[in-house]
């Protein structure tokens, strides 16, 4: 459904958010979930008035401080999802993350 350029733009959005909000964490893997699985998340886009959704799965490690304190210290989070949305081919925006 999405071009490599659109997916790369989404990766940039996730990386920017991760760097800003997940201090003390190290991202080890980030991948597009694929067109088929991506469709399962369209309701997230609709909730914010968008018409497209892009979903990534990631793995990351948390340092001994627990990142900002909301994560378990010295833990690896596997299969963490990042949900992005946009309208009419605009910029991707982070709308949710988690399991």
Predicted features and spans:
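Flexible low-complexity loop/turn motifs enriched in small/helix-breaking residues
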Residues: 1-76
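Short beta-strand edge/turn micro-motifs at domain boundaries
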Residues: 77-99
């Amino acid at each position: 459904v999405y071009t490599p350029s659109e997916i790369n733009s989404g990766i940039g959005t996730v990386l920017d958010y991760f760097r800003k909000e997940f201090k003390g964490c190290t991202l080890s893997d980030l991948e597009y979930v694929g067109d088929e699985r991506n469709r399962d998340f369209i309701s997230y886009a609709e909730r914010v008035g968008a018409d497209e959704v892009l979903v990534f799965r990631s793995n990351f490690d948390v340092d001994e401080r627990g990142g900002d304190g909301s994560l378990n210290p010295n833990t690896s989070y596997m299969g963490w999802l990042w949900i992005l949305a946009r309208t009419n081919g605009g910029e991707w925006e982070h709308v949710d993350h988690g399991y």
